[in-house]
Amino acid sequence: MALSRTHRVVAGVAHTRVYKKIWKYWYPLMTRGLGADELVFINWAYEEDPPMDLPLEATDEPDRCHINLYHRTATQADLSGKRVLEVSCGHGGGASYLTRTLGPASYTALDLNPAGIKFCQQRHHLPGLDFVQGDAEDLPFEDESFDVVLNVEASHCYPRFPVFLEEVKRVLRPGGYFAYADIRPCTEIAEWEAALAAAGLQQISHREINAEVLRGIDINTPKSRERVKRHLPIFLRAAGRNYIGATGTPPIPPDAKR
């Protein structure tokens, strides 16, 4: 997936120690400013060719392309009857969908954003689904607590990615699974892959999904632009379109991989 200029700056900041201070204020602001009640997914989009055509409830249909990425990532493992942890759950749309459709025994969704967690606790009420405020680099759970750990388009914001991977390994039970999707500029791919290789986790599958994400963004662009126009003041709209990933946000060079 390509990075816009705004995303380049954000990605650079994400690898510094000021990261938590920035995200500490940005995500609560987004929760309030972009209309959280309709924005239950904050991951970018995904669609295959031919389309995945997942059977969705009518209330899920507007978020189809967001759900596609969650579904494709999570179904790399069997969640049925499993203890699942999602790290960086955003506004909880993915947690809700996966809990309703894939039958985990329990689903714990964690995020650093306290406003987002409060929203999730008020919005998503399902048996076995729990939302917790916490840090991806210091997970507040006992060793070997989960069968599956899920992370969707979030770890590029972690300043200490190897520490996050250590935490994933710590909370996974023996034989557990880490299901993961994210983005890096091409200049950081080698470092990214080296960190994954050093984490002590066996890689079972891997694929690049640039085309699928761009296709999903194209489909979602009209809705994304309307959402930005409705909820953000004029001087923030360009940054908002860049952040949410709308077709035509300049520049989008082909120098990143997912």
Swiss-Prot record:
MF annotations from Gene Ontology: sterol 24-C-methyltransferase activity
EC class name: transferase
Xref: CDD domains: AdoMet_MTases
The EC number(s) this enzyme carries: 2.1.1.-
Alphabetized SUPFAM superfamilies for the sequence: S-adenosyl-L-methionine-dependent methyltransferases (SSF53335)
Pfam family of the protein (one): Methyltransf_11
Keywords linked to the UniProt accession: Lipid biosynthesis, Lipid metabolism, Methyltransferase, Transferase
InterPro entries: Erg6_SMT_methyltransf, Methyltransf_11, PthPhpthDimycoMt, SAM-dependent_MTases_sf
Record GO biological process: methylation; sterol biosynthetic process
Record family assignment: Belongs to the methyltransferase superfamily. Phthiotriol/phenolphthiotriol dimycocerosates methyltransferase family.
PANTHER family reported in the protein's UniProt record: HYPOTHETICAL LOC100005854, ZGC:194242
Annotated function: Catalyzes the methylation of the lipid moiety of the intermediate compounds phthiotriol and glycosylated phenolphthiotriol dimycoserosates to form phthiocerol dimycocerosates (DIM A) and glycosylated phenolphthiocerol dimycocerosates (PGL).
Name of the protein in its database record: Probable phthiotriol/phenolphthiotriol dimycocerosates methyltransferase 2
